[in-house]
Design a protein with these regions (language model features):
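A structural "hinge/loop" feature
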Residues: 58, 78-94, 118, 145, ...
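Detector for C-terminal structural segments
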Residues: 76-78, 91-94, 241-246, 250, ...
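Ligand-site clamp/hinge motif
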Residues: 136, 223, 254-307, 348, ...
Length: 615
């Protein structure tokens, strides 16, 4: 089942650094001859040591004796038109991650550590310039054929050519790849312009989705498809009703069922996803017994939407489960490619006009926390004044950053958050002053530029439940003479417009793990700003942001990493690229009483893969 945490592993590649021989050779062809000088081990930790020993039997947050059987159903919103999750085209169905596998898999109880899956051994060069994986001799595709190094090399080449932009970018860092035998594959990595090596690259290769080379013979990898694609994972697709429903069945002879990284997981015989256009309808379907579990992101629904016989008699159980992961940084994101949002003063002004305290109380029942970081709910968030490792990361750019960044903590506007209407009025006066500095004036109740063009823009949404906040935001801009309108489209249109960067403002988020890395360049880097399908929705083009984001991937200690992430966070906050909204410090989950979970909850929060069905 798909986790609600969006953990994208992405980096900005430097194609100019790729040598002429960087293309993946045919299986068995010679390459540079990749030197290795580190010991063979059972996994990789981004920083420090692995928490689990080589002989561990299961992750600590699962129940190895969990009951097998039953069905887990989810009522979800949206639609889908593809069963191929690893290309740009199409909207893939939920749950496909359980069909495909990777060489290594994450422990969700560590910031960023990987253990064996398709590969049972890994050897990393001391400077992380190369990595070797040994493929598990038992690894099998769903047709019973073995997973081989040829499949891995094929997958790399397909991702380089046709993968999502983030994957194309970081797989371009592979300078050489070779398969000395059917169970071994080696990768060497290009260095950065300053000679450093992206220390995350061995882990990113471990997380590359592996496809069957034989399956794709005669098929176009770069086309959306509703034909089930053969995988090696614990589930296969059973039935598909395009856009409406998809059902997965557990692979009875799944090759990896007894692996330490799989034991106690994927317990249901069937996973069913029923799609609804509206989340309120999906909630009613869940309450009516057409779903077994629901992650609730809407505090209003959590506060008032679950009452009914099933909850009162105990058939529905609601839980608030704490987690220690960064929550998604959700906000109203400015598309700074649009001329009206190119000026920082304009972006700052628009963030000062809304009474978010009222929104938090009235719309969210006081259950959410206002977001004031790109890494909220974690020790990665900038706080106070920069010091230590963070200050060291910022110092080289002091002359290119606002002086206030070093002497004043970043704070959200106070108006409406305890200072009452007077504070909000003061903020709006300051907002008008900033807009006037940027060349805008209120004339006859309309904010216009010198040529008489009105300040007008559209907020693009895909979920009707988001309209409440967006409409309140637009109303708060009316006293400034701004014409802001909300447009809600279906999920396919929404994703298409985001991919093509055809929007003024949108309500979206950036999600990070406890070990941010190369994906930060894809979220905020200059090169990603102009790429179709980019996650740099804001269109950020700032050399300081580029340098800080790039430095994160080469941090050698946890302390260095935290300091550099905090530095990036602080620079992004002072750039006012979004109007921050809210986040929840807990996971709110409603489930059927017949759906059970392990006693231990991992660092990143509850993992539905480890739950089971029992009377």
């Amino acid at each position: 089942m798909a986790r609600p945490i969006l953990l994208l592993l992405i980096l900005l590649a430097l194609p100019a650094l790729r040598p002429a021989c960087a293309e993946v050779p045919e299986h068995g062809a010679p390459t540079h001859g990749i030197a290795m000088n580190a010991g063979v081990t059972h996994g990789i930790a981004m920083h420090g040591d692995l928490a689990l020993p080589p002989d561990f039997t299961a992750f600590p947050y699962v129940d190895p004796a969990a009951r097998k059987g039953g069905t887990i159903r989810q009522a979800v919103t949206g639609s889908f038109d593809s069963l191929h999750p690893h290309i740009v085209k199409g909207v893939p169905a939920l749950g496909l991650g359980h069909v495909f596998e990777t060489l290594l898999t994450r422990s969700w109880d560590e910031p960023f550590s990987l253990y064996g899956l398709l590969a049972d051994r890994v050897e990393v060069a001391g400077d992380r310039s190369a990595v070797t994986f040994r493929i598990n001799a038992n690894a099998r595709w769903h047709d019973g054929t073995p997973v081989t190094a040829a499949d891995v090399l094929f997958s790399l080449e397909m991702q380089r050519r046709h993968g999502t932009p983030n994957r194309r970018l970081f797989y371009a860092k592979v300078a050489a790849a070779e398969a000395p035998d059917p169970q071994t594959v080696r990768f060497a990595f290009a260095s950065n312009a300053d000679g450093t090596i992206d220390r995350e690259m061995p882990l990113l290769m471990g997380l590359m989705p592996i496809h069957s080379k034989a399956f794709w013979e005669g098929r176009d990898f770069n086309r959306t498809t509703l034909e089930p694609i053969m995988g090696s994972g614990p589930y296969r697709i059973a039935t598909v009703d395009p856009g409406r429903r998809i059902v997965y069945e557990r692979v009875r002879d799944y090759w990896g069922r007894d692996l330490p990284t799989r034991l106690g997981q994927f317990n249901a015989d069937r996973l069913e996803f029923d799609y609804y256009r509206d989340d309120s309808v999906a909630l009613e379907a869940f309450k009516a017994g057409q779903g077994d579990v629901r992650y609730e992101s809407d505090p209003a629904k959590w506060a008032t939407g679950y009452d009914g016989p099933a909850r009162r008699d105990g058939r529905i159980v609601r839980e608030e489960l704490p987690n220690r992961r960064p929550e998604p940084a959700r906000g109203l994101i400015f598309n700074t490619r649009r001329p009206i949002f190119a000026d920082l003063r304009v972006r700052r002004a628009l963030g000062m006009a809304t009474d978010f305290d009222w929104i938090g109380r009235s719309l969210f029942h006081g259950l959410l926390t206002r977001t004031a970081s790109y890494y909220p709910n974690s020790d990665l968030a900038a706080r106070g004044l920069p010091e230590g490792e963070e200050l060291r990361a910022l110092e080289p750019f002091r002359d290119r950053l606002p002086p206030e960044l070093f002497i004043r903590p970043f704070t959200l506007p106070d108006g409406g958050t305890g200072s009452g209407p007077a504070g909000l009025r003061a903020n709006r006066r300051e907002a008008l002053r900033l807009l006037e500095q940027a060349g805008w004036r209120v004339r006859d109740g309309r904010l216009t530029d010198a040529a008489g063009n009105r300040f007008a823009f559209e907020i693009l949404l895909s979920d009707p439940s988001e309209e409440r906040v967006a409409l309140e935001f637009t109303r708060s801009l009316e006293p400034l003479g701004i014409d802001a309108r909300v447009r809600t489209v279906d999920s396919a249109q929404f994703q298409g417009r985001l991919d093509r960067l055809e929007f003024d403002m949108t309500m979206r988020w950036w999600a990070s793990s406890l070990s941010p890395g190369n994906e930060q360049l894809y979220y905020y880097g200059s090169e990603a700003a102009g790429q179709e399908g980019s996650r740099n929705l804001a269109g950020i083009r700032d050399p300081v942001v580029d340098a800080l984001a790039r430095s994160i991937a080469v941090a050698t200690t946890r302390a260095e990493l935290i300091g550099r992430v905090r530095a990036l966070d602080r620079v992004l906050l002072w750039g006012h690229y979004m109007v921050p909204l809210f986040h929840s410090p807990v996971d709110r989950i409603a489930r059927r009483s017949t759906l059970h979970r392990p006693v231990n909850t991992p660092l990143y929060g509850p993992m539905l893969e480890s739950w089971w069905v029992a009377p």
